[in-house]
Amino acid sequence: MRFFIDTANLEDIKKAYKLGVLAGVTTNPSLVAKEGVKFEDRIAEICQAVPKVESVSAEVTPDAVTAEEMIAQAEELIKINGGDKNVTIKLPMTLAGLEACRYLTEKGVKTNVTLIFTVNQALLAARAGATYVSPFLGRLDDISEDGVLLVAKIAELFDVHQLDTQIIAASVRHPDHVTRVAMAGAHIATIPYKVIEQLAMHPLTDQGIEKFAADWAKAPKL
């Protein structure tokens, strides 16, 4: 399973990129709005900051309701950073989103269909040609449903029908989500920087480092 970072914060993206574990970036209108920057400018900055990732998801804005409006926005977004091949168009899981997905896929544009909450939605998106689908774990957990089970069902379905669409586990809130979706068959987990930090931490690791440092301080030095 690969790691994307789910943020529009440039500093967090740069920190994650330096770790050598980052395969992509996902953004959405809410994340960009929180940064208080122009959407297109931030996507360009992200592309420049992480040139070796496979995907930077740029989502069409909520005022694009029809397939035609989504496609028009997508055509502008893929021009960002000189037509950067890493820009992936993120589309909502609606009928219009599916129509736009099919059109963009036929043009060779990578797509990420987001706000997936059922297996049937994932199957429709895959059949429309989506490069990625993004099932949301945390939001399902909030209504007492099992987001990890959804990922497992989608993974099984894609395997049975030999679908190439990749699963991005989204709305990931803690390390246990990451462990469980990796075991469930997600290709990618897109996570906030704070979860990346949590994945790297364990109190016994800290204690071990402190013990090594204390013992080394006592060792004879040449």
Curated annotation (Swiss-Prot):
Q: Which PROSITE patterns does this entry report, sorted A to Z?
A: TRANSALDOLASE_1 (PS01054), TRANSALDOLASE_2 (PS00958)
The pathway where this protein functions is: Carbohydrate degradation; pentose phosphate pathway; D-glyceraldehyde 3-phosphate and beta-D-fructose 6-phosphate from D-ribose 5-phosphate and D-xylulose 5-phosphate (non-oxidative stage): step 2/3
Q: Which SUPFAM superfamilies does the record associate with it?
A: Aldolase (SSF51569)
Task: List keywords of the entry alphabetically.
Answer: Cytoplasm, Pentose shunt, Schiff base, Transferase
Q: Where is the active site?
A: K90 (schiff-base intermediate with substrate)
Q: Where is the signal peptide?
A: none
What are the subcellular locations of this protein? Answer: Cytoplasm
One annotated GO molecular function: transaldolase activity
Q: What's its EC? A: 2.2.1.2
Q: Name one GO cellular component term.
A: cytoplasm
Name the catalysed reactions.
D-sedoheptulose 7-phosphate + D-glyceraldehyde 3-phosphate = D-erythrose 4-phosphate + beta-D-fructose 6-phosphate
Look up the record and give one Gene Ontology term from the biological process aspect: carbohydrate metabolic process
Query: Which NCBIfam families does this chain map to?
Result: fsa_talC_mipB (TIGR00875)
Record-stated family: Belongs to the transaldolase family. Type 3B subfamily.
Function of this protein?
A: Transaldolase is important for the balance of metabolites in the pentose-phosphate pathway.
Q: What is this protein called?
A: Probable transaldolase 2
Question: What is the species of this protein?
Answer: Bacillus cereus (strain ATCC 14579 / DSM 31 / CCUG 7414 / JCM 2152 / NBRC 15305 / NCIMB 9373 / NCTC 2599 / NRRL B-3711)
- Identify the gene encoding this protein: tal2
